[in-house]
Regions:
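Glycine-enriched, solvent-exposed interface loops adjoining structured elements
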Residues: 1-234
Length: 234
């Protein structure tokens, strides 16, 4: 649906739910409830996909948000070529990224210069990193590297990605040639297009979710004005 169609659906469904007893709703107010419903829908989808994995601090590949599910229109892939030298556990590869609209990082892959591509990295929370590095079963290896992330205050609160491959100085050195970052964008903030202006912003979630979002927005609106509706009925 376009944003105009979502507004029309909001008013139609609202009348079915009893909103004809309430004075007219401004487009700006409908936008507020639509955006709240969009954000709640996205977070619920993410929660159902990764909640169990995040409880243990590790996000495995099987639990990641993929572009074939409900958030496929928000799925992004960014590839960065690496030209620096070798990296080891005591000097891991670090990359500062400037993605301001990221809702959730889902997957990381690295390429080696010898031709080995798309080696999946395990995402470890920073507070679990020390245990992962010293544990024989979870420590990083060339074929199962580890990625951790944190926000660097000195870098204007940009995200720092740290990659560890378990290599030591005596190893045959494998050079990291590139890194692929997969993430979910925040959804767009929808805005009604006032006649005569070209400021409308449509919902960028898949079409089949739009009706569910509108219905959730109406329910949120009714919940916010339910005392008023009760008074009018009396």
């Amino acid at each position: 649906m376009t944003i105009q169609e979502m507004h029309n659906e909001f008013r139609t469904f609202g009348q079915v739910m009893g909103l004809q007893l309430v004075r007219g709703i401004l487009p700006e107010s409908i936008d507020v409830y639509l955006n709240a419903a969009i954000n709640e829908t996205v977070r619920n989808i993410i929660s159902k996909n990764v909640a169990n994995s995040l409880q243990v601090g590790i996000l495995p590949q099987a639990a990641s948000i993929t572009p074939i599910n409900a958030l496929r229109t928000l799925y992004r892939v960014h590839h960065t070529d690496i030209t620096e030298s070798y990296y080891f556990n005591d000097n891991p590869f670090e990359l500062i990224v400037d993605f301001h609209n990221v809702l959730l990082y889902t997957d990381f892959y690295i390429d080696y210069k010898d031709g080995k591509k798309d080696v999946h990295c395990r995402l470890i929370e920073p507070d679990r990193l020390s245990d992962a590095l010293t544990d024989y079963c979870t420590r990083p290896t060339i074929n199962e590297p580890i990625v951790t992330m944190f926000t660097e205050v000195a870098e204007n609160y940009l995200t720092v990605i740290k990659v560890m491959t378990g290599q030591i100085e005596s190893d045959d050195k494998k050079v990291i040639d590139g890194i692929k970052i997969c993430y979910i964008d925040n959804p767009k903030i929808v805005k009604y297009n006032v006649e005569g202006k070209n400021e409308g912003v449509d919902c960028d979630l898949p079409e089949y979710l739009h009706e569910e979002i509108v219905q959730l927005a109406v329910k949120k609106y009714i919940a916010s004005i339910s005392p008023t509706m009760s008074q009018q009925k009396n």
